[in-house]
Amino acid sequence: MQIQKKIEDITFTPMTLFGEEMEVSENIVMASAAGWYVGAICKEDDGFIQPYDRYTDYYATPEEAAKVLEAM
């Protein structure tokens, strides 16, 4: 997983999901082996960061995904 933004610059919002507290990020440009996309990450109590959700299709470049994020 790649993230286009520094972790310390990402805004996280506390959420309760399935009885568990976690912090979920704002929408950000991310990448996986399949390509670049707009999604979110979550931060667990121990500080572990992992992908949370993907909101768009995959794109070939981070610039393409960033344009979609700007339009959201």
Sequence positions of predicted segments:
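Short N-terminal "domain-start" leader segments
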Residues: 1-46
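Short intrinsically disordered terminal tails
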Residues: 1-3, 67-72
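Generic alpha-helix signal with a bias toward terminal, lower-confidence helices
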Residues: 24, 48-50, 70-71
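A short, hydrophobic secondary-structure junction motif
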Residues: 36-40, 59-66
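A short, exposed loop/beta-hairpin motif centered on an aromatic-Gly-Thr core
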Residues: 46-64
